[in-house]
UniProtKB/Swiss-Prot annotation:
Cell wall biogenesis/degradation among keywords: no
A Gene Ontology term for the protein's cellular component: cytoplasm
Subunit organization: Homo- and heterodimers.
Keywords: Cytoplasm, Metal-binding, Zinc, Zinc-finger
Short name of any one Pfam family annotated for the protein: ZF-HD_dimer
GO biological processes: regulation of developmental process
Source organism, top-level taxon: Eukaryota
Zn finger (ZF-HD dimerization-type) location: 24-83
Record has Transit peptide as a keyword: no
Name of the protein this chain belongs to: Mini zinc finger protein 3
Phylogenetic classification of the source organism: Eukaryota, Viridiplantae, Streptophyta, Embryophyta, Tracheophyta
Region Disordered: start-end pairs: 93-113
UniProt cross-references to InterPro entries, sorted A to Z: ZF_HD_homeobox_Cys/His_dimer
Organism: Oryza sativa subsp. indica
Amino acid sequence: MMKRLVVLRRREPAVRFSCCGVRYGECRRNHAASTGGHAVDGCREFIAAEDGGGGNSTGAVGVAAAALKCAACGCHRSFHRRVQVYEVAWDDDCDSGDTSSSSPSSSSSLSSE
């Protein structure tokens, strides 16, 4: 006796997501880990530290290291929560139906005045 296999094909969604960038949120470093407690500093967002430019001979290495240090709390960027920011792309088929119905109403309201 043979079993039948049914395959259902689904249409792709009209919305596509693409990753635009990365943002770093609140600091999650536990400052009381050595004593067995839990204490965070309350830094809400990663702010890259700027290099002071005080005659550092390391040049680009010093600038890169400063970009990974938070100016607000002094922690490394890896302690901050990483948040990926997505861009939503819509298909033109969905938008064309809405714009065609709204454009005559706006033109008719202009002509009636």
